[in-house]
């Protein structure tokens, strides 16, 4: 009876304009822009586009980080983002030899670069994307920010190297095998973590924008779903994953992806050789010491963009506004209630009520397995329309599929002259309504209340309902036999289901 379900709930994104403002305020992008504006003819870079060591102090000073012991590292990180996002263009050192100006020699270039020789340093110019910072559309800003996110993601999955010289071979190349680093595995791990954090954020009943404890996030990547009490070995893996994530979220926070409260360093010292393993029971204050993280609105946008690029179906509230009623009703079929209403309200805002009502009613027809839920959502959408929709609703009073919901709408809106429904329409609507709720996979107790309310309202319900010409009659009666809390009524439902199937 159920149609294909979306793998992820819909996300409510901020507008592009709001997200663009958030992107421009991200600390790392702010630093990258500042360095791009600072860079000039005397700026020298290495073969990989990195600032030469001698220029890092000046770059740190531009960022106001001259007195910070990590200032040069922050400057180097911001410069990489400036290069990778096109805020600056790097000109390869080899290109310098093509200059026609005899005074534009490698030696003069190297004077500013310190230990680098002229033949080893390149130059930079302002990149085309620098102008987008002040003159670009929101979509341009977000594209630039996504490029920065890619750079930071790569940094977060890169191995920590304490002594790079020890990894450089005699031929000058880095021995990556000695790092014991699996780049694909590292990227897959972080993708999985961000995916789980995204799901926790958008799921109904999730943290509703609140922070997620780092132990819970680490456990979601390590502890098997069918495991009861985690073993010591698994807890050790959770501890290792927490430490790994602590480093990665510290790297991801400056680009504006997450808000992160790091693991308490004092806790790491307290734990000593055992690692920062959370105890079995701890209060709310204890949990925060193990790290707390949440995706920002910009982070939701960024993670969703990566998922879309990977080919996943990642719905967002509002993306159905320009589509037809059939796409709307199919699209929101398994949305959480609040998201379905928000999507519907947005869809209705762009249409006159009479036209919207006609389109919704036309899309609600059908005998396919998803039709009952489409009709339920059509009825809920119609309930948001005023009296302007009445002519369209009255036009389907005699329709065997829509006549019942039309009468419900008219009654709810206090209309006069509502014709009494034929008895078969009453039972057909009951079957259709239960079929829709079964497909929706809603709260079981609410469904039981609905079933018992419908059966109690009509005398001889099971003596009549099995004759209803509805594709889901037998399935609905079988479900009623399972769910009805009154045993005699449940038995009647099962008998009626047998009759419906025997009738063919």
Model-derived regions, located:
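Structural detector for internal amphipathic alpha-helices that build alpha-solenoid repeat scaffolds
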Residues: 219-222, 330-331, 341-351, 373-385, ...
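Short amphipathic alpha-helical interaction segments
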Residues: 69-84, 237-264
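Alpha-helical adaptor scaffolds
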Residues: 346-348, 411-454, 460-461
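Alpha-solenoid HEAT/Armadillo-like helical repeat scaffolds in large eukaryotic proteins
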Residues: 263, 319-320, 327-335, 359-369, ...
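Short, amphipathic alpha-helical interface elements at domain boundaries
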Residues: 1-110, 114-155, 159-234
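Amphipathic alpha-helical scaffolding segments comprising HEAT/armadillo-like alpha-solenoid repeats
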Residues: 249-251, 325-326, 354-366, 386-397, ...
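Generic helix N-cap/helix-start motif at coil->alpha-helix transitions
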Residues: 321-326, 335-342, 357-358, 368-377, ...
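C-terminal engagement modules used by replication, chromatin/transcription, nuclear envelope/ESCRT
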Residues: 251, 257-318
């Amino acid at each position: 009876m159920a149609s294909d379900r979306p793998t992820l709930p819909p996300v409510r994104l901020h507008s592009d304009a709001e997200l663009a403002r958030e992107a421009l305020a991200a600390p790392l992008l702010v630093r990258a822009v500042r360095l791009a504006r600072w860079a000039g003819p005397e700026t020298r870079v290495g073969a990989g586009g990195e600032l030469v060591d001698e220029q890092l102090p000046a770059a740190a000073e531009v960022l106001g980080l001259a007195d910070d012991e990590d200032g040069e590292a922050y400057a180097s990180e911001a410069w990489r983002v400036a290069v990778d996002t096109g805020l600056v263009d790097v000109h390869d050192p080899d290109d310098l030899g093509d200059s026609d100006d005899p005074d534009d020699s490698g030696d003069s270039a190297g004077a500013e670069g310190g230990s680098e020789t002229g033949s080893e340093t390149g130059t930079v110019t302002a990149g085309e994307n620098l102008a987008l910072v002040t003159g670009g559309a929101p979509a341009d800003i977000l594209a630039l920010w996504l490029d920065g996110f890619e750079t930071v993601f790569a940094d977060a999955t890169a191995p920590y190297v304490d002594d790079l010289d020890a990894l450089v071979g005699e031929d000058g190349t880095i021995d990556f095998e000695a790092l014991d680093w699996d780049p694909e595995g590292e990227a897959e791990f972080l993708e999985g973590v961000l995916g789980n954090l995204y799901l926790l954020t958008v799921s109904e009943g999730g943290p509703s924008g609140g922070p997620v404890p780092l132990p819970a996030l680490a456990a979601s990547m390590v502890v098997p779903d069918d495991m009861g009490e985690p073993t010591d070995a698994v807890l050790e893996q959770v501890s290792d994953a927490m430490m790994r994530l602590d480093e990665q979220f510290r790297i991801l926070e400056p680009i504006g992806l997450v808000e992160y409260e790091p693991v308490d360093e004092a806790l790491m010292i307290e734990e000593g050789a055992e690692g920062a393993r959370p105890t079995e029971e701890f209060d709310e204050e204890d949990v925060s010491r193990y790290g707390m993280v949440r995706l920002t609105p910009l982070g939701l946008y960024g993670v969703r963009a990566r998922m879309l690029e990977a080919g996943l179906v990642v719905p967002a509230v509002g993306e159905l506004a320009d589509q037809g009623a059939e796409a709307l009703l199919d699209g929101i079929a398994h949305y959480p209630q609040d998201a379905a209403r928000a999507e519907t309200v947005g869809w209705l805002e762009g249409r006159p009520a009479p036209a919207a009502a006609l389109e919704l009613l036309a899309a609600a027809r059908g005998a396919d397995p998803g039709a009952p839920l489409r009709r339920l959502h059509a009825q809920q959408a119609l309930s948001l329309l005023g009296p302007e929709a009445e002519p369209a609703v009255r036009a389907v009073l005699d329709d065997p599929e829509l006549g019942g919901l039309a009468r419900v709408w008219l009654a709810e809106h206090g209309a006069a002259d509502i014709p009494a429904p034929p008895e078969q329409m009453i039972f057909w609507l009951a079957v259709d309504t239960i079929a829709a709720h079964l497909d929706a996979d809603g709260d079981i107790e609410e469904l039981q209340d609905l079933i018992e309310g419908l059966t109690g309202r009509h005398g001889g319900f099971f003596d009549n309902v099995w004759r209803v010409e509805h594709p889901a009659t037998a399935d609905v009666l079988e479900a009623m036999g399972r769910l009805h809390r009154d045993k005699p009524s449940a038995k009647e439902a099962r008998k009626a289901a047998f009759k419906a199937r025997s009738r063919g």
